[in-house]
Amino acid sequence: MRALASKGEVKTFAPGDLIFKSGETGDCMFGLLEGSVELSWNDESGHEVIRAGDVFGAGALVTPEHRRYGNARAISDCRVLMMNREKFLFAVQESPMFAIELLASIDQRLRELKDCTKLS
């Protein structure tokens, strides 16, 4: 998140605001500074809540079609850092620790989602 903060642009969202929509071309990733965001996919049947300190939306920067595969909506007032693809690639090249922190964040979220599906 530190590398994102030094290269990103801060944007605010109110509760209910759509941050991005499934099917859109994604040109940036996000780091959540304050608030909470709901990610949903599969026609809203799947969802995850993102909290301050987490990153989301990076997948669109690394897939060939740069497409969003879900919706992101603010649950509460949010402050979000946005980093475009060019700055993202620069951060990964200049700071391998940035890439490791990003992978750790994604890994943690995948583990939490996996645990949720076991309980269902």
Task: Name each region found by the language model.
Residues 1, 68-69, 86-120:
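A small-molecule sensor/coupling module
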Residues 4, 40, 58-59, 83, ...:
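Residues that scaffold the ATP/ADP-binding catalytic core of kinase and kinase-like folds
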Residues 12, 43, 92-96:
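Flexible interhelical turns and helix-capping residues at alpha-helix boundaries
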Residues 30, 39, 61, 82, ...:
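Alpha-helix boundary/capping detector
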